[in-house]
């Protein structure tokens, strides 16, 4: 009898212990025992993916970046992020729809790319803007109309910070705050360069191989990896392979932008798409103190979207519709301006300055933009025209009662009707620059990487978002769609990993 009671007691004790263990492991302790998702790259795509995985799904993340700081190229984005039919547009009485945004995107893509990805990009743009506003308290309350857009839809916040910096700062701060409270939920590892992905015999991800800051080869065990490693706009080697006619141009890309993700994934059997489609941005600033530097500050497209115009550097005359698509404006500069220095003058009114004060002040602090009188503009840039003739040119552009000579669709913040040779303007020298690579690894609508010569996925555990992927923009990306792509497909990658995790 006593033995039976003891046996029952032991069984009950074991049962209770099992229940307690299960309950313990079902909480945050279990999170620490799961293999993390590895996110490669800390630009906006990587930050979006990481925040979504952690905040919505409590899935642990290791964020790896070979650079010494967070942000990638996203942190330098200066015009904003696109969205159609957003609350901001409705508040500012701008009529827009995802369908119109898609029409503009397809027109800019010129028959290249994957239309279903463009459809996703534009349809989910409103929710992307709202996610940034609600999750990270970003205002995104101002709009600009950039080249190739039918209406103003490129969002930025009123305040002192450029949009890329503001967005990256907000998302990275949230990650760092979470990491400080629970290092098991998120680890941020900089100076860590990913060199390979380990797969088992069935093609499932088992680990990420990387070199740590001391040059040691290490393996991070994981079943899911998201490539957010950016494009290849800094790599002369890859430009020579895919777009050799552009290797002589300067670039806006950081030194980390060398196509590592494309190389690794291609070696694993991923399909590459549109690799020859490299965007040349028409306006990179020429530093008057370092004219030959291969790296250029981007002259934000918002400078033209908010009213800036381009003048021929010899004649002082306008020569193009400044709000055409980037490839068209680039072609106009290269074909109509002197070929020996491949430049134009970007000229802006006081009203443009008032609408973009903080950014222009930054450019002025770098000596990239000067505030000068019309007379001084003629003298300093050795224009073969008179100050009076230039005043006439600026007045002609500013006359909203006549059709624009170059069919510019939006004329705002124009020059005063009483402008004179003593009036001041803002001016900078600009030149076309390698800016963005539309090509990359092919993905589907779930952000999964596609296998070469197939529509099947490379592996259920491999995803990509941002500039590392291709097909989202076709032959030419619209300004403001780079940051949008990062948010839309970064969120998508996180949501679909959560279904598999």
From Swiss-Prot:
The UniProt record lists the keyword Cell membrane: no
GO biological process: FAD metabolic process; protein folding in endoplasmic reticulum
Positions contributing to FAD binding: 37-51
Location of the active site: 281, 304
Primary localization: mitochondrion
Cellular component terms (Gene Ontology): cytoplasm; endoplasmic reticulum; mitochondrion
Enzyme class: oxidoreductase
Cofactor notes: Binds 1 FAD per monomer.
Residues of the transit peptide: 1-32
Cofactor: FAD
A Pfam family that the UniProt record links to this protein: FAD_binding_2
Compartments where found: Mitochondrion
Reaction equation(s) it catalyzes: succinate + NAD(+) = fumarate + NADH + H(+)
Keyword line: FAD, Flavoprotein, Mitochondrion, NAD, Oxidoreductase, Transit peptide
Signal peptide limits: none
Task of the protein: Irreversibly catalyzes the reduction of fumarate to succinate. Together with the second isozyme of soluble fumarate reductase (FRD1), essential for anaerobic growth. Involved in maintaining redox balance during oxygen deficiency conditions. Reduction of fumarate is the main source of succinate during fermentation, and under anaerobic conditions, the formation of succinate is strictly required for the reoxidation of FADH(2).
PANTHER family: FAD-DEPENDENT OXIDOREDUCTASE 2 FAD BINDING DOMAIN-CONTAINING PROTEIN, FUMARATE REDUCTASE
Name assigned to this protein: Fumarate reductase 2
Organism: Saccharomyces cerevisiae (strain ATCC 204508 / S288c)
Gene symbol of the encoding locus: OSM1
């Amino acid at each position: 009898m006593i033995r039976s009671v003891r046996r029952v007691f032991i069984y009950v004790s074991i049962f209770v212990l099992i229940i307690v263990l299960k309950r313990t492991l079902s909480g945050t302790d279990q999170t620490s025992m799961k293999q993390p998702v590895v996110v490669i790259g800390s630009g906006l795509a990587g930050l979006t993916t990481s925040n979504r995985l952690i905040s919505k799904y409590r899935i642990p993340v290791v964020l790896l970046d070979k650079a010494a700081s967070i942000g990638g190229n996203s942190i330098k984005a200066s015009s904003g992020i696109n969205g159609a039919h957003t609350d901001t547009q409705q508040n500012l009485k701008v009529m827009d729809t995802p369908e119109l945004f898609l029409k503009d995107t397809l027109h800019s893509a010129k028959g290249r790319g994957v239309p279903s990805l463009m459809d996703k990009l534009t349809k989910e743009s409103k929710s992307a803007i709202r996610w940034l506003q609600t999750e990270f308290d970003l205002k995104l309350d101002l709009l600009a109309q950039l080249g190739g857009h039918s209406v103003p839809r490129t969002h930025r916040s009123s305040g002192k910070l450029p949009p890329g910096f503001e967005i990256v700062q907000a998302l990275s701060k949230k990650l760092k705050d979470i990491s400080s409270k629970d290092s098991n939920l998120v680890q941020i590892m900089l100076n860590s360069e990913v060199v390979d992905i380990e797969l088992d015999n069935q093609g499932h991800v088992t680990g990420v191989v990387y070199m740590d800051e001391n040059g040691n080869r290490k393996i991070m065990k994981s079943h899911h990896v998201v490539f957010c490693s950016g494009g290849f706009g800094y790599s002369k080697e890859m430009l020579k392979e895919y777009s050799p006619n552009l290797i002589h141009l300067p670039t806006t890309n950081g030194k980390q932008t060398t196509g590592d993700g494309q190389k690794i994934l291609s070696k694993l059997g991923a399909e590459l798409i549109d690799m020859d489609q490299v965007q040349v941005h028409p306006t990179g600033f020429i530093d008057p103190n370092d004219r030959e530097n291969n790296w250029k500050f981007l002259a934000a497209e918002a400078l033209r979207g908010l009213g800036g115009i381009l003048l021929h550097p010899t004649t002082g005359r306008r020569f193009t519709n400044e709000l055409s698509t980037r490839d068209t404006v680039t072609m106009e500069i290269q074909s109509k301006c002197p070929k020996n220095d491949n430049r134009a003058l970007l000229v802006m009114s006081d009203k443009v300055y008032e609408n973009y004060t903080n950014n222009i002040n930054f450019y002025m602090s770098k000596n990239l933009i000067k505030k000068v009188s019309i007379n001084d503009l003629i003298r300093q840039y050795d224009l073969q025209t008179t100050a009076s003739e230039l005043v006439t040119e600026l007045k002609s552009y500013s006359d909203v009662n006549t059709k624009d000579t170059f069919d510019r669709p939006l004329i705002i913040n124009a020059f005063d009707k009483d402008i004179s040779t003593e009036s001041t303007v803002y001016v900078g020298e600009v030149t076309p620059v390698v800016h963005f690579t539309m090509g990359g690894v092919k993905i589907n609508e779930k952000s999964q990487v596609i296998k070469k010569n197939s529509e099947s996925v490379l592996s259920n555990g491999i995803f990509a978002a941002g500039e590392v992927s291709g097909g989202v923009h076709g032959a030419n990306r619209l300004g403001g769609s780079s940051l949008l792509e990062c948010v839309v497909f970064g969120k998508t990658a996180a949501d679909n990993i959560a279904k598999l995790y």
